[in-house]
Design a protein with these regions (language model features):
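Hydrophobic helix-coil surface modules that form long, contiguous segments used
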Residues: 4-18, 23-179, 208
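Hydrophobic alpha-helical and helix-loop surface patches within well-folded domains
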Residues: 81, 111-285
Length: 285
């Protein structure tokens, strides 16, 4: 898994420069069109950000099967990717990846790259279509034509046009992580807020929308799908470890204070806003 793997420019916006180093938590990047070439042993299957520009030279499930495959006679293949209008680029490679492509809403290609727990990774494919359909209807259309869900990384982490998810052994965990990380395609990658400065605006918003999506897609019919967020925030509020919601993500004194403030309190914020102004009005904001 290759993430945070290249020197990044500091973002400059109306607030000035944001030169915060990446310390394994939140990050903020510069909008750009990425052209990336990766030369790697021909046995490896690659997935990640961007559209593959030379699928008939690569194969590995990317090619048009109605056309001839023309691989170069070499030990390595050079993968050419183009990613328009994104602010990050991530990729993963493994010779044992299984690569499936499923058509999602609005003809978006959903790519799945995985090695183990095949039954669960097959099962998540239709649910991923359902999740993207829900997010499209609730938030707005996914702005790219491809999204990849890749078994790799550490836990689950969102990147431009893709997510990396470690597991798959437990389907509930795989579904929940997929729902949350896919939600980040809107709340952080499309919205492009400074998640390092305002982590609750991406983690909290993603937690809010993934709870709604899980309730609908899995037909759980919970009266309050945000109950766990309320319970988590209540424990933090009673712990005397809570810090101001404006605290920078890298400046929390306690990791639990960061996690609950960003994820749970952020979700509670939207749930409470919906209670105050109405769900219909919230959907329009």
């Amino acid at each position: 898994s290759m993430t945070q793997w290249y020197p990044k420019l500091a973002e400059y916006d109306f607030e000035g420069w944001h030169p915060n180093p990446y310390i394994g938590r939140e990050f903020h990047g510069v909008w750009s069109d990425y052209t990336v070439s990766l030369s790697i042993d021909k046995s490896y299957v690659v997935g990640g950000t961007g559209y593959l520009q030379n699928p008939q030279e690569i194969g590995h499930g990317y090619e048009n099967t109605e056309k001839s495959l023309k691989r170069p006679d070499s030990k390595k293949l050079t993968w050419l990717f183009y990613a328009p209008n994104v602010h990050d680029f991530a990729w993963a490679a493994d010779p044992d990846f299984i690569h499936d492509i499923v058509e999602g809403p609005n003809s978006v290609e959903l790519h799945f790259l995985y090695k183990t727990h095949v039954e669960n990774w097959k099962k998540i494919q239709q649910h991923s279509v359902d999740l993207m359909t829900f997010f499209n209807n609730k938030i707005g259309p996914y702005p790219w034509k491809q999204y990849s869900i890749i078994q790799g990384g550490d836990g689950g982490m969102e990147y431009a046009m893709c997510t990396l998810i470690t597991g798959g052994e437990n389907y509930g965990s795989l579904f929940g992580t997929t729902a949350h990380e896919m939600g980040h395609a809107w709340f952080q990658h499309a919205l492009a807020n400074n998640e390092a400065k305002h982590p609750w605006m991406d983690e909290g918003f993603a937690s809010y929308i993934d709870a709604m999506a899980e309730n609908v897609v899995l037909k759980k019919n919970k009266k309050n799908p945000f109950l766990r967020s309320y319970q988590s925030y209540r424990r933090l509020a009673n712990s005397k470890m809570e810090q101001p919601q404006t605290t920078h993500s890298d400046r929390y004194s306690f990791n639990v204070a960061y996690s609950v403030s960003a994820y749970s309190k952020g979700a509670v914020f939207l749930a409470q806003l919906g209670y105050l102004i109405g769900e219909e009005a919230l959907d329009k904001t």
